[in-house]
């Protein structure tokens, strides 16, 4: 290894990545993890990624400190140093060995799970991938050469190193013994690491002096920790496993050394020497601390895929550190240290895991210390915390310990997690863990031991999520960052064997996994794409690291970060272990089959390289975040608020995701797909080596982290295929894998990846068996409290077992109930939907992990975005027992995860703030950040919802609440692609647009009115609000909407009510009961705003709702403690009382009582009491007004006394008090009877008039009141019409004429209640006519628009006849008064003229019209005469020709030539004059002698126009135009004088023309008729001037 590493020093990027991978792989040992991390940084100091990551993390940290400008300069300097720092090949080799050793242990079990999970190792493309920039520092692009000479191979998933032939032995050995072995082996590596660190520190120190001067405090912390690491490393032995530890420490120390070198090279050396004096554990712990600090500040150490593996074994130990973190919260450092020690001894396959615990503890303490330096979080010294943690780890059971740290598990407790479980060191590294999860996923695919792999993946997921949240800084250090969250988690799970660890990890991952699952596609189809372009990844990682660093710094300020990280780590682990829950429940470890995979080492190398590259999260950052989390936990315990701020409301999972360095770096739980940038990274590592089994679903965060770290992407192939954006950024799309994992097909890349794996025997050796865990052990799984959300992470893991998935569903269905914001996003299609089985299994894992964590219930409330549950419709209701168990675990996880979530949210918010400036890191990161940002926006967590397992199975569990940063879109809406298809299919089929059964007029939008979803057109041409007169439509719509009682429909009804009655007043169709029902429904659906709006509008339109509605509003406000709504409610109440609402004393007392409950002010209560006193003054002394029976008795009394004024007052009182409109109508009918029947004629007054006068004085009269009063008047009118009491009837009509338009109303009683409108109008007109009021009669007719018989107002033939007689009578009377216009109006509206339905012969009206025409002509009313003539001609009414001729003559003499010519032409068509056509064109005009001069002139005009062509032609000047004055038969009998007068009229006609015409007398014909000739010149002149209009009038306008 050393030779190889040294040989590859030239390849800075690859060697750095590889070294980092090796370091992470060696992170199995707690100390080695630290050493490895440091070594990675040292070795990777040679590799550019290491330097970059540390640089970026430190810069992120600086950003958090507000020194963003320095970050860029430091980055540049560190980059320069990176090139210089390519020096520690030995360290690389050591790290690789250590990583391989640790990986061997995990790989045993991972290989077991490999077949099922198709763990895709990093393909050789990983080698090509230099370090990911996001994880720059620690990211080791593990090249094949990095493998040990002993054929140590990197597990693709965890990045752990396969122990060479002795791995199986090490597995068999007691975890303690393994740990012991590891410790000595770590010593030489630590020495090497120390040297490397020294070198790196020197390089960094040289160029970073200015930077150090600015950030002395932070670097000092880093330096102290680095020195400790160096001393520890020097003190550690040279065993292979310990080499792994050393390598891990080396990585962490390299990072630390980098910063420390930046701070003081000598100082690091001195501190390292001093630290060397301390014991191994203490050194390891310190190394961890320092490495964590370094990571935290540096953020440059990118965890390679190996780092997650190393971190996983370290996680095993870190479980104890995790316990220690809890202890730190409890301030029981010593006990926690003992537990760590025990945990270290307990891990089955990974001796390195124990050192990682110590390391993790040390890292925690160092992190805390550094945090305390930067942000005073803990006063406890890092060394003391480390020692205590180490002791606890030794003596305490590695059982899941509540995040709060209230309890530590005794070493003798039953359930323990195998050492194989990666010490949750990897978990702390959120981004690392994400990558690590991917690596673990790969390993899981590679190994059959799903439990182990899942646990590791879960740990990784949890770590990644926690890292994401705690700090993107952790992204830099693969193993170190991993160590921290894992340590927290491992303390809880380490108690038992691998299973227990897995369960813990599952629980941890459960929280994160839930969130991660939303982001990640199901692990079943997860593919790990390691592209040769690691530089891109490294750049992305570096960005993320910077983001993470800043976030980590912020997280350090927020103590809650630790808890959040823990939970996040736990959730991620749960994600990785879908089947682990089953194993834990069933305890059937024997059922695990260890699949044989070929070329496992190569894949592992690739994966490790990827994981190391991506897992850039530094353990220091994790420790900082954890220490912050501890403080935050305490704060959280004190403060029940789940979310301190909007960003803090982010779920743990979101915060855990380290991949997203920027504010967008946080993945939303709902996003099932990793952003395209992640895919890009994953695919950039061209070999898509990582494919997770169906059982392995990495939470979205975990997947995202995996993609960053391992360049892997976990998702269902189908889902991936559906997501073009997945491939948009990817160089190569995911390829289907032929091999099946857990019965699922893996992508072809998996087979390709297999080529790089080592021997099958080694795979067996690397695997570790799980030990049965007591399923119902409350100590292990914790006690869940009902009502709490099971997963803060909220995304169920997808397991291959549908039963498990159902369990998760049951547990997560509670989350499902929480409202999920489903906002359409471009990425919606891009998110693959996890398989139901894998989701279930992951849910179980997350449940178990969550149960182990046991945090305060205060944090149980998860922000809305965090509480979503994913279940696939394909899941079957099987395995209820498992589901129940998982749900229990889930509940437990809920509790613990909730606390972690809150803390993690806080951390995330801090990280988000610090990294908000780095929004452009990666597209995928941005998507994840967008998803995470949404929870940040939620200020208040939602209460947990409980669902039964059956309900959970049936419910379609949404993805994690679609939390998104501004401008971001949720990546996933539906959990299952089939569900998506069904949804689309149903939408296309219009399933959701099913008509509601309303009959809507065509002019209205049927979608808006008649469907639940409403109109979706951007611009609809149809009306969305009823128009005036369609109040009945409004009422029908309201009734239908109220009956359906859908929230959207009720809101629409409220809007429709507001829009309609703002424009139009209530009419006869207004139903007060509908209003009350609408208000009641709105109130039931908590639509208080709409209720207030409608109530205020009702006050304006004087339609008061029922009193019970008002009381319900007060009750609602008091129950919900809506103090802010009290002022508006009091104001509305006062208006209602002023408007006439009557309240009893009891009502006022009740309202006051409610106001006291809501803590209303004295002024508000006083206002209510004042209204009470005012109302008393307005009320009658008797209470009968509210009693209808008493009111009726009062009415009888009024009737007997004839006190109609008092009756009006009673009417008003009843109107205000009566709640039901129907009752009020019946009351009005009774009033009408009183006013009409049994009235004594001798009484001069009209009861209705006095009654109407009193009622009309009320200013509060609405349109409905007027309508009812009018209907009472109609009944009275009928009554007097029957009695022929025309005067009284007219008084009634006069009163209605003043106040009400009654022509469209009907009576309330008797036949008038069903009488047609024509009949009512006829009776009213007749009363006016009989009483001598023609104006009144015409007013009634005009108000009714002269309607007789229409489809809307049908009537009988008798009514039509009555109308005819009535109009004729009125016409004669009006004509007698020379009211021609009114007469003509009446005649025009006779039956038969309005529509075709009136089959009346209009010719019978000839006498009336001719009489009118004659009268108009006689009176010289030419305009009216002309109108009457035109109407008669148009309606074919026979007209008297004499009247028409007189009209034409009068019009001509009055110079109204246009009308005269028109009527003359009409007269010609009617035959009034002899035809002219026969002689017109013969140049001969025959004019009857009886015509007037006007008629003669008009005849001459026609003659000239007809012969215009011949007259105007030049050759016809000699032709003669003759006019013959024809004698008629009548004229023959007359005297000569008459004919002579005709001759004079002819001459006059020629003169009055314009221009004048000249005629000559030529001769007398045989009939003694005078013959005249028309002079050609005058005719030609006339044509020139009048030809244009002449042609139009006489030739073309023939009728």
Swiss-Prot record:
Residues 1-42, 159-185, 802-836, 867-889 are annotated as: Disordered. This is Protein TOPAZ1. Keywords: Cytoplasm, Differentiation, Spermatogenesis. InterPro entries: TOPAZ1, TOPAZ1_dom, Znf_CCCH. GO terms for biological process: cell differentiation; spermatocyte division. GO terms for cellular component: cytosol. It comes from the Eukaryota. Expressed in both adult testis and fetal ovary, mostly in germ cells (at protein level). It is found in: Cytoplasm, Cytosol. PANTHER family: PROTEIN TOPAZ1. GO terms for molecular function: metal ion binding. It comes from Ovis aries (Sheep). Residues 168-183, 805-832 have a biased composition (Basic and acidic residues). Residues 874-884 have a biased composition (Polar residues). Important for normal spermatogenesis and male fertility. Specifically required for progression to the post-meiotic stages of spermatocyte development. Seems to be necessary for normal expression levels of a number of testis-expressed gene transcripts, although its role in this process is unclear.
